[in-house]
Amino acid sequence: MGRKRLITDSYPVVKRREGSAGHSKGELAPDLGEEPLPLSVDEEELELLRQFDLAWQYGPCTGITRLQRWHRAEQMGLKPPPEVHQVLQSHPGDPRFQCSLWHFYPL
């Protein structure tokens, strides 16, 4: 039986020169100077509702609307944010606002 072969026996080792031609380790990507666009009012409200969906201290959010969850949390004395209730009242028929983050995923 012969000696075990290593992968480097089949492929030559190529050492690359480190120098100023490329970037060295530890360099950060160049700053593009672009500022993120400010969110629209609807996007800010939807982000608030997403955060409400992800806050488990108000109970589970699958199978019920956000407004039902808000009312249930209030009845249980969990003190849900009043801003969430205001947003939900201002968009009564819009499923983007009324349905939870997980609504479109099958159970």
From Swiss-Prot:
<keyword id="KW-0832">Ubl conjugation</keyword>
<dbReference type="GO" id="GO:0043625">
    <property type="term" value="C:delta DNA polymerase complex"/>
</dbReference>
<dbReference type="Pfam" id="PF04081">
    <property type="entry name" value="DNA_pol_delta_4"/>
</dbReference>
<feature type="compositionally biased region" description="Basic and acidic residues">
    <location>
        <begin position="15"/>
        <end position="28"/>
    </location>
</feature>
<dbReference type="InterPro" id="IPR007218">
    <property type="entry name" value="DNA_pol_delta_4"/>
</dbReference>
<comment type="similarity">
    <text>Belongs to the DNA polymerase delta subunit 4 family.</text>
</comment>
<comment type="subunit">
    <text>Component of the tetrameric DNA polymerase delta complex (Pol-delta4), which consists of POLD1/p125, POLD2/p50, POLD3/p66/p68 and POLD4/p12, with POLD1 bearing DNA polymerase and 3' to 5' proofreading exonuclease activities. Within this complex, directly interacts with POLD1 and POLD2. Directly interacts with PCNA, as do POLD1 and POLD3; this interaction stimulates Pol-delta4 polymerase activity.</text>
</comment>
<keyword id="KW-0234">DNA repair</keyword>
<dbReference type="GO" id="GO:0006261">
    <property type="term" value="P:DNA-templated DNA replication"/>
</dbReference>
<comment type="function">
    <text>As a component of the tetrameric DNA polymerase delta 4 complex (Pol-delta4), plays a role in high fidelity genome replication and repair. Within this complex, increases the rate of DNA synthesis and decreases fidelity by regulating POLD1 polymerase and proofreading 3' to 5' exonuclease activity. Pol-delta4 participates in Okazaki fragment processing, through both the short flap pathway, as well as a nick translation system.</text>
</comment>
<dbReference type="GO" id="GO:0000731">
    <property type="term" value="P:DNA synthesis involved in DNA repair"/>
</dbReference>
<protein>
    <recommendedName>
        <fullName>DNA polymerase delta subunit 4</fullName>
    </recommendedName>
</protein>
<feature type="region of interest" description="Disordered">
    <location>
        <begin position="1"/>
        <end position="35"/>
    </location>
</feature>
<dbReference type="GO" id="GO:0071897">
    <property type="term" value="P:DNA biosynthetic process"/>
</dbReference>
<keyword id="KW-0235">DNA replication</keyword>
<keyword id="KW-0228">DNA excision</keyword>
<feature type="short sequence motif" description="PCNA-interaction protein motif (PIP box)">
    <location>
        <begin position="1"/>
        <end position="16"/>
    </location>
</feature>
<keyword id="KW-0227">DNA damage</keyword>
<keyword id="KW-0539">Nucleus</keyword>
